[in-house]
Regions:
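Membrane-interfacial helix-loop connectors
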Residues: 40, 127-139, 169-182, 311, ...
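Short amphipathic alpha-helical coupling elements at transmembrane boundaries
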Residues: 55-59, 87-98, 127-138, 147, ...
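Long, contiguous bundles of hydrophobic transmembrane helices that form the permeation core
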Residues: 4, 172, 179-290, 395-415, ...
Length: 444
């Protein structure tokens, strides 16, 4: 074994370097983690790596909380198939037709509801772009501010429950998913409020950025408005609040609530006569693809993280940084910057499953609340989704609104990236923003 000639902890640093290089050059993440974990584990502590691999994969397969992932994914896809978000957007558009910037408010409100229904960023940005861009163009809205609003609203799916990322993050950080859901609600509403305040101020200073809607886009009667509003808001809101509320108030586990939500979304699609055999098949295939990707990554990263921890590198790194006697908030700032930079080229999945377990011992040693830290990570990754040059949200939006210049989309996103940073700083300075609701609900 190589451990006879080199400190296993140093071997762990080499493992991280090789892993990052392999991912950045394009090797499949799951297979890279399994292969490197096996090779470096065998070099570091021999045949024990076989038992470690079996144990970690078995733990993932028997983790009941992760069963909520495919159910929440299916719930979101069926809500999309039923066309409920389009109806809700139309209702808000009609209600606020005479208000400056009304379409910005409609996008943000729908994005909050849709985030609570799906938890998938790509789907949120795509649907919001399809729904809103045409009306915004016809009404003469500013492309940059419109693009920023759509992409920022779409990224709320990372944070607002039932966020798929929070469902996965809970078992990894050994935090109850209910705590993470409760902690994410107020920060999510805070960010949406900051977005709305920003668009309001911009439209007040320059009314041409969000003019009132032209007559052809307004309702012919208030009856039409209220029918659209009721049919668009009440069913999805009732479904979301039933699923989320049952989790927060302890009536059901996340998996049970996800199962009820999935069945409810299927019934809604049937009630609205939007469900066909082809759409159901597509929804099931999409659910399978997304869920399989996440589950294999969870298992692979669990094994990789276990090997890395067994090599002793996390403790060596923690002892080294604590020995420097730096201010703990300075170390937190360094961690946030690192996660932000990694969020440019990488999806949230490898960051949450690989990087977070590596730095978790350090965060615990510094005495930070793990629930609060998890919300900081979520908001930080949301910020990275809005940050050029990679900015994955920009490409989702460009794909459905090709007439918008990518430069304008980038410029619009950067405005909201600054708002995200302000929100992140507020949560750091005032931890109660994230921790008050879990404490109130669960007495922590």
């Amino acid at each position: 074994m190589l451990a006879e000639f080199i400190d296993p902890a140093i071997l762990g640093f080499i493992l991280i370097g090789v892993m990052l290089f392999s991912i950045f050059v394009g090797f499949p993440i799951s297979f890279t983690l399994i292969f490197l974990g096996f090779v470096f584990g065998y070099l570091g502590f021999g045949k024990l790596v076989f038992y470690l691999m079996t144990l970690q994969f078995s733990m993932v397969m028997t983790e009941q909380t992760l069963a909520a992932v495919p159910l929440f994914v299916f719930m979101g896809i069926m809500m999309e198939q039923a066309g409920l978000m389009e109806r809700l957007f139309s209702a808000f558009q009609l209600m606020l037709a005479k208000v400056r910037g009304s379409l910005y408010y409609a996008v943000l409100f729908v994005s909050v509801v849709f985030a609570a229904a799906t938890g998938i960023v790509g789907a949120s940005v795509t649907i919001l772009g399809i729904m809103a861009a045409k009306s915004m163009n016809r009404s003469g809205y500013n492309v940059r501010l419109a693009a920023g609003t759509i992409t920022a609203g779409g990224t709320l799916g990372i944070l607002i429950p039932p966020s798929i990322m929070l469902v996965v993050m809970g078992p990894i950080m050994e935090i109850p998913v209910t705590d993470l859901f409760a902690a994410a609600i107020i920060p999510g509403i805070l960010l949406a409020t900051l977005y709305a305040a920003y668009t309001t101020i911009r439209c007040w200073i320059d009314p041409s950025l969000g003019p009132v809607l032209p007559p052809e886009l307004r309702a012919t009667s208030m009856k039409e408005v209220w029918i659209e509003f009721f049919l668009g808001l009440v069913p999805p809101a009732a479904l979301v609040f039933a699923a989320l509320g049952s989790i927060l108030f302890g009536f059901a586990t996340p998996t049970e609530a996800a199962g009820c939500g999935a069945m409810g979304s299927l019934l809604l699609a049937l009630a609205y006569k939007k469900l066909t055999l082809k759409k159901l098949q597509d929804a099931l295939v999409k659910t399978l693809e997304i869920s399989a990707l996440i589950m294999v990554l969870v298992a692979a990263s669990n094994f990789f993280g276990a090997v890395f921890s067994r090599l002793g590198t996390p403790m060596l790194l923690t002892d080294f940084l604590l020995g420097l006697e730096m201010n703990k908030y300075f170390i937190l700032a360094l961690i946030m910057v690192m996660i932000f930079l990694l969020g440019w080229p990488l999806e949230w999945v490898p960051i949450v499953m690989i990087i977070i377990p590596i730095i978790l011992p350090l965060v615990e040693a510094l005495g930070f609340n793990l629930t609060w830290f998890a919300i900081l990570v979520a908001v930080n990754l949301q910020t990275a989704w809005l940050s050029p040059p990679v900015a994955l949200s920009a490409y989702f939006l460009k794909g459905v609104v090709p007439e918008w210049d990518l430069k304008d989309i980038y410029y619009g996103m950067m405005q909201f990236m600054v708002i995200q940073v302000i929100g992140l700083i507020l949560i750091i300075v005032f931890p109660k923003i994230a921790l008050w609701l879990p404490a109130y609900l669960y007495g922590q």
